[in-house]
Amino acid sequence: MINTTQDIKKFIDDTSFKKIFVLCGKKSFVTSGAEIFFKELLNNKKTKLFYKSSELPVLEELIKIIDNIKSFKPDLILAIGGGAVIDYAKIANVVDIRDDLADLIVNYSYPFKKKYTKLAVIPTTAGSGAEVTSNAVIYVNGIKHSFESELLLPDNFFLIPEFLMSAPNKVKASAGFDAIAQALESLVSKKSNSQSVEYASKSLKVSVNSYISFLNNPNLKNATEMSIASNLAG
């Protein structure tokens, strides 16, 4: 479940991706150490970077991302960041810009057809496990709406605990609480099944044991445990 940067390097080197669209959070991309690693890794690839500017995933910025992806025509989208970055990438890979997009989102009626290209995600927070879920969130006029489709599932994800450790405590705290809340919600949901209950129970056990130490003294061990807890919660 846990990866190393060498796993990402092997993935990029062993595939025929020539054009890579990188979607990331401007601050987290730098502070996590991802910027240095990926600039070297992608040095011989044609890349386009898009830095997320809105704290929440909003329709206006989503449209800009879709427009940038369609004009660049990548064969891989690489999402490196927290839940908002990953949700943006998941949605942008399956949604087209159209005049009635806002109405379709609000009415939960977007006609999903296919993915635009391959999507790989690397979380820089340990939160709701967006890398393994088939749903994503977008805000329209300040109101939260959800997309849900199997097409939203990323094709690949990589859990790199080292990328989590330098996040601000406020980010670590809210993301970790997200993982705990998601696991609790799964345990009491009427839609839960034996497998989801098993994953949620494991997630809760790990996160409760590691959450406080991850905030007070982040290290590779508790960052790894929170990565696992987040992934299981998703």
Language model region names:
Residues M1-L76:
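ATP/NTP phosphate-donor binding region
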Residues F37, I66, V85-D99, V132-N135:
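Short Gly/Thr/Asp-enriched flexible loops that form oxyanion-binding sites at enzyme active sites
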Residues K19-F21, K48, D75-L78, T117-P123, ...:
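Structural motif
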